[in-house]
């Protein structure tokens, strides 16, 4: 069962169990997938759907932080719950320790020295950890090693 089919079956399950939060969250992702399919005029593959789910998780995370700054805990909680629902569809996230180790390996492999080689490292790391680690975290750790 691919990710798109899993989203559809989980949506049906949420309808049956009357879980309105999960239902609304999954519907928004399915809508984003369909909009992307319409824009590109083709069916999306697994990787594209995964990218959309990652984008939706990132949106929820940003919204939660804005609600926190605005002292709106009830809306922040809702965004966090939606984010947790969506994270179940993402591959298991890599630990920061493993990510640090891999960044160190890539730096040694490419012979990177300083921030001038930052692009080389990111070009290798981002596709490798797509969906498994946040790009902002990869960027932060890579720049930490290069400085």
Show the residue positions of the predicted features:
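Charged, compositionally biased, marginally structured helical/coil segments
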Residues: 1-147
């Amino acid at each position: 069962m691919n990710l798109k089919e899993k989203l559809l079956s989980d949506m049906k399950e949420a309808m049956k169990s009357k879980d309105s939060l999960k239902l609304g969250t999954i519907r928004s992702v399915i809508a984003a997938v369909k909009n992307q399919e319409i824009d590109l005029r083709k069916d999306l593959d697994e990787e594209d759907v995964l990218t959309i789910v990652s984008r939706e998780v990132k949106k929820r995370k940003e919204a939660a932080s804005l609600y926190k700054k605005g002292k709106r805990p009830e809306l922040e909680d809702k965004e966090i719950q939606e984010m947790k629902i969506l994270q179940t569809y993402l591959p298991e996230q890599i630990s920061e320790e493993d990510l640090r180790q891999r960044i160190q390996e890539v730096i040694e492999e490419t012979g990177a020295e300083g921030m001038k080689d930052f692009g080389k490292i990111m070009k290798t790391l981002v596709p490798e950890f797509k969906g498994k680690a946040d790009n902002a975290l990869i960027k932060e750790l890579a720049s930490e090693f290069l400085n």
